[in-house]
Amino acid sequence: MVKSKLLKLTSAILIIILLIFSVFAIVGCKKKDKYRAENPVLLISIDGMRPDAIQNTDYGKYLETVCSYTLNARTVYPSITLPCHMSMFHSVEPSEHGVTENSYTPSPEMGNGIAEALAEQNKRTAIFFNWSPIDNLVKPNKNVYSKFIDPTPIGWEEANNQTAAACIDYLKNNEVDFTFLYLGFLDEAGHADGWLSEEYYYALNQSLALVKQVVSQLSKDYTIIITTDHGGSGYGHGSDSTEHMTIPIFVMGENYAKGKRFDSASILDIAPTILNIIGVEIPTYWKGTPLFVKD
């Protein structure tokens, strides 16, 4: 009887020991296999943000002190949201990628964009947006995470809030090489109430407050690019006027000098800048060049 109890006790102890070792082995494997983004980049596009407008905000003035930047970069013509973002991601003019209005009609010859170039090197991309055509900027693949917040039932201001929150939550738990955050509230305010109106500045400050929240959650190894697709005047955009074609670009990171201005810059330079930071070869057919300023 005693021997039987001892055997049962010994067996129970052995099972417990085996379970403990199994747990440690599983945890160890998870740690070993955890993906690591070596040089992560966050690109933020605040749709319709004029450089003279952000210059009039407290956060805009702060960015000028901690970033390499320009308030005089050029976007592409036509200065419309989807064509401009397609050029931002593919570093070619709309005449080459084929998207010349806010509908997705790409050229059959259109090459890789940021996400596709990264995916070929098994690098990860995540995009967060609240204007549905933005989904066309990347081709679906296993290395891309996409999150759309629909503004229709909740309004644009709340859609901005939820889009930024989704970005923060995802990056807390996932390693990503390239993250794109698109905020559409400002452009909608411009169309509804006019560029540089009181409502426009309200939307701008709300958007910048969200940018500040997102940036505050990131580790120091991130490089952060804050920009836009186009400007605007009156109640619209799309022309080749200075108010529509001039955009700001801010770059914050260890390899970018604080308070220094880029000599010249274009929306076409954003994609090659991102690949250069991450360490992936830039496609030869891209038209832009990496933005780089150091002390």
Which residue ranges define each predicted feature?
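Catalytic-site neighborhoods of secreted/periplasmic enzymes
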Residues: S95-E158
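Active-site His/acidic residue clusters
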Residues: V138-N141, I168-Q213
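Polar, surface-exposed loop/tail segments
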Residues: V280-D295
